[in-house]
Amino acid sequence: MKPYQRQFIEFALDKQVLKFGEFTLKSGRKSPYFFNAGLFNTGRDLALLGRFYAEALVDSGIEFDLLFGPAYKGIPIATTTAVALAEHHDKDLPYCFNRKEAKDHGEGGNLVGSALRGRVMLVDDVITAGTAIRESMEIIQAHGATLAGVLISLDRQERGRSEISAIHEVERDYGCNVISIITLKDLITYLEEKPEMAEHLAAVRAYWEEFGV
């Protein structure tokens, strides 16, 4: 695990974005941890979040021309990541995002920001069922662009209804890499380093053994 990944876990814990306990997910599955990226909700939070996303992008080595943030959660992520890439990595790249409803006046259309073209890096918080990715792919393909990859904050590394995860389904269906700032394995590694979190480690390990991919 790299330093920025460890720092991201501590950032998420500090902001209570990442919590341990017993949580019932939308699927009905009981999880020993919960991740709610919506709690990154101040200016400083967003500035830091953008730096972690930018670090993961640079670390991945994936080549891309533009950042795309699917409405709604992906919008601030794309914006802050673009700023962080320019300020901290000297990479001044365009970004855009979609509207849920297309405008019929003013600039019109369903996109805001740069023209959607070239190799597109999609940024979002998490992938649960992959629905937002599929909707975004329709937009990307309609503009003649290609998907270079997808970056999310946390890869839960668990299977959904089938034997593979929603992330693996996206990789299979669109032939792209899905990368993340951290994975469930990183979280387990972090817990292993913290004796005071031993009770959570046992629960997360058990969950991984039952549902992990």
UniProtKB/Swiss-Prot annotation:
Q: Per the record, what are the reactions this protein catalyses?
A: orotidine 5'-phosphate + diphosphate = orotate + 5-phospho-alpha-D-ribose 1-diphosphate
Pathway(s) the chain acts in = Pyrimidine metabolism; UMP biosynthesis via de novo pathway; UMP from orotate: step 1/2
Q: Which GO terms describe its biological process?
A: 'de novo' pyrimidine nucleobase biosynthetic process; 'de novo' UMP biosynthetic process; pyrimidine ribonucleoside biosynthetic process
Its domain of life reads Bacteria
Enumerate the GO terms in the molecular function aspect. Answer: magnesium ion binding; orotate phosphoribosyltransferase activity
Q: Where does orotate bind?
A: 34-35, 128, 156
Enumerate the residues binding 5-phospho-alpha-D-ribose 1-diphosphate. Answer: 26, 72-73, 99-100, 103, 105, 124-132
Provide a GO CC annotation, any one.
cytoplasm
* Cleavable signal peptide: none
A Pfam family per the record: Pribosyltran
Tell me which cofactor or cofactors this protein depends on: Mg(2+)
Q: Which UniProt keywords apply?
A: Glycosyltransferase, Magnesium, Pyrimidine biosynthesis, Transferase
Described function? Catalyzes the transfer of a ribosyl phosphate group from 5-phosphoribose 1-diphosphate to orotate, leading to the formation of orotidine monophosphate (OMP).
Quaternary structure note: Homodimer.
UniProt lists the family membership as follows: Belongs to the purine/pyrimidine phosphoribosyltransferase family. PyrE subfamily.
Please identify the protein, giving its name as recorded.
Answer: Orotate phosphoribosyltransferase
